[in-house]
C-alpha cells in the first residue's frame, strides 16, 4: 500500500509526501477536477497539520518496523535544506527524499542529488528514492528502486525499505549490484556488467572513476570526519543506466 499526501493545513510550503506501507488514504488528488470529487465532499489535500497527519500515517503502517514517509520531489517543490532537515529530524520513520522523480523532468527538476549530498554532509541519514511518479501510457518512464528483502513478503520488503536495504536505478535494464559491503574500513561492490563506478562523499568525488565489474576502496580512519558519508554509483554507458547505492554515514 502507498498513498500521496499533500496540502497540509499548517505547511507554508509545497509539501508532498508518499507513505509506503501506510494503509491510510488521507485525501484525494483530483488535480484537474476530472472526477468532480470535491463536489461530492472529498477534500483536495489532507487539511490537517503535518505532524498530526504524519502520526496517522505511522499509526496505519502495515508493520510497525517497516515502511515510512518519503519526501516527494524536493527540487520541484523548492524545499530549503533547513526545511528538509527539520522534517528528517522529526522522526526516524521519515526515510528520505526522492532523489529522482521522472515526472518532474518537464520542469527540469527531476534530479535532487545536490540536495541529497547536502543533507548527508550534515551527518543525517537520508535514503534516496528513484520514482516514476505519475506514469502515462506509451512513455519510457524512468526511476525505480530495487529492494533487497530477506523474504518475498510485503512486510519483509517494507523492513528492507526502513533499513535502507535497497538501491536506486534509472532505466531498469537489468544492470544490478551483485553485492555492496562496507565494514567501516573497506568498501567493496560488484555489478553483473562492466560499469563506471564513482564514489562520492562530503568533499565530492573521491579518487578516479573505476571501470569494470568490481570496486573496492580502503577508507583511512583519519578521514572519517572529512568525508562524513560515502555513497557509490555505477553507470553503464551514456544515458543507458545508472545505479545508486544507499549512503553509509561515517559520523555518530
Task: Please report, for each region that a protein language model flagged, where it lies by residue.
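Extracellular/periplasmic catalytic domains that process cell-envelope and extracellular macromolecules
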Residues: 10-13, 62-63, 88-92, 121-123
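Active-site regions of enzymes building and remodeling cell-envelope glycoconjugates
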Residues: 2, 17-18, 95, 144-145, ...
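Short, hydrophobic/aliphatic alpha-helical segments
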Residues: 111-125
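Histidine/acidic-residue-rich catalytic or RNA/ligand-binding cores of hydrolases
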Residues: 12-17, 79-90, 108-113, 136-151, ...
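A metal-dependent hydrolase metal-coordination microenvironment
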Residues: 1-68, 72, 99-115, 131, ...
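C-terminal functional module detector
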Residues: 65, 122-127, 132-252
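Glycine/proline-rich, flexible active-site/cofactor-binding loop segments
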Residues: 64-102
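Short, well-ordered alpha-helical segments in soluble proteins
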Residues: 98-104, 123, 165
